[in-house]
UniProtKB/Swiss-Prot annotation:
Name of protein: Probable Fe(2+)-trafficking protein
Organism: Shewanella woodyi (strain ATCC 51908 / MS32)
NCBIfam families to which the protein is assigned, alphabetical: PRK05408.1 (NF003817)
The protein's role, per its UniProt record: Could be a mediator in iron transactions between iron acquisition and iron-requiring processes, such as synthesis and/or repair of Fe-S clusters in biosynthetic enzymes.
Swiss-Prot/TrEMBL GO biological process terms: cellular response to oxidative stress
SUPFAM superfamilies: YggX-like
Length: 92
C-alpha cells in the first residue's frame, strides 16, 4: 500500500514520495508534506528554469536560486515565472 501525505501544494490527501529525494531538513519537509504528483509538477518547472536561465548545477548560487524557487513553489503557493514562456493553448 502506498503511503499518503496531506500535500501542502495540492491541499489534499495524495500519494507520497517513495523515499526522501532531497537532502537535509528541507528534504524531510518535502518527504512529509509533498505528494508524488506535486513533486512531478515541480520537476517540470525545475527543468524549465534550468534550461531557460541556463543554470549550472555545479554553481552554488544557481543551486541556491533553484532551492528558493522550489520552496516558493511547493510551500508558498508562488508559481515559477519564466520570461518569454507562453503556455501552449489547447485547440478545442
Amino acid at each position: 500500500m502506498a503511503r499518503t501525505v496531506n500535500c501542502v501544494y495540492l491541499k489534499k490527501e495524495a500519494e507520497g514520495l517513495g523515499f526522501q529525494l532531497y537532502p537535509g531538513p528541507l528534504g524531510k519537509r518535502i518527504f512529509d508534506n509533498v505528494s508524488k504528483e506535486a513533486w512531478g509538477l515541480w520537476q517540470a518547472k525545475q527543468t524549465m528554469l534550468i534550461n531557460e536561465k541556463k543554470l549550472n548545477m555545479m554553481n552554488v548560487e544557481d543551486r541556491g536560486f533553484l532551492e528558493t524557487q522550489m520552496v516558493n513553489f511547493l510551500f508558498e503557493g508562488k508559481d515559477v515565472e519564466i520570461e518569454g514562456y507562453v503556455p501552449q493553448k489547447d485547440d478545442d
